[in-house]
Amino acid sequence: MSRYLGPRVRVIRRLGALPALTNKSPKKRTIAPGEHAHKTRKLSEFAVQLQEKQKLQYYYGITNSQLARYFRQARRSKSSTGLALLTMLETRLDHLVYRAGFAPTLPAARQLVNHGHVKVNGKKVTIASWACEVNHVIEVKSSSPPKPPEYLPPYLQLSNGTLTVTQPVQKEWLAFVVNELLVVEYYTRVGA
């Protein structure tokens, strides 16, 4: 399966607010998509875990196999598995380009990276999943100045069109609400 190219507002209606997915908002319809969306029923424990996993998947624009690979790497880390998973996802190059305001959405940031408009420490990088570390300097070749982001997390520093990762990521600095423990429970249950 490749990247999700379907209707993004439908995903937002189903999973809740995902700011990186699109600039549009579901103004007309606030209920979930589908024929029987108005009928509410209690979700099972597995369904809640699956929804949290899908939130991460759609927000960061990655596939199920990529998220499973990140989970396996996070499980091997010495810190908390959930925090390590979120740190890996937050420090992806395409996500940092989006968070700095160089692109309006995550798919646009991914395209900037893929088309070779981004340099990391002075070297051109075309891999959207590039893992940035502390003290990495990110520059975007652009004719227009970046739009100032609504919220620049404390682990990023933006000056003169360059972005610097200054410290490790904390959970409080995420742009949306996610319960990473449910994602960890999901992957331990399905055996990733």
UniProtKB/Swiss-Prot annotation:
Classification via HAMAP family: Ribosomal_uS4_B
Signal sequence segment: none
Species per Swiss-Prot/TrEMBL record: Cyanidium caldarium (Red alga)
InterPro entries attached to this UniProt entry: Ribosomal_uS4, Ribosomal_uS4_bac-type, Ribosomal_uS4_CS, Ribosomal_uS4_N, S4_RNA-bd, S4_RNA-bd_sf
Top-level taxonomy: Eukaryota, Rhodophyta, Bangiophyceae, Cyanidiales, Cyanidiaceae
PANTHER family assigned to the protein according to its UniProt record, in alphabetical order: 30S 40S RIBOSOMAL PROTEIN, SMALL RIBOSOMAL SUBUNIT PROTEIN US4M
Protein name stated in the entry: Small ribosomal subunit protein uS4c-2
Pfam families: Ribosomal_S4 (PF00163), S4 (PF01479)
Biological process terms in GO annotation: ribosomal small subunit biogenesis; translation
Family: Belongs to the universal ribosomal protein uS4 family.
Gene3D superfamilies: Ribosomal Protein S4 Delta 41, Chain A, domain 1, RNA-binding S4 domain
Primary residence: plastid
Subunit structure: Part of the 30S ribosomal subunit. Contacts protein S5. The interaction surface between S4 and S5 is involved in control of translational fidelity.
Role, per record: One of the primary rRNA binding proteins, it binds directly to 16S rRNA where it nucleates assembly of the body of the 30S subunit.
An example Gene Ontology CC term for this record: small ribosomal subunit
Molecular function terms from GO: rRNA binding; structural constituent of ribosome
UniProt keyword list: Chloroplast, Plastid, Ribonucleoprotein, Ribosomal protein, RNA-binding, rRNA-binding
Occurrences of domain S4 RNA-binding (ranges): 91-155
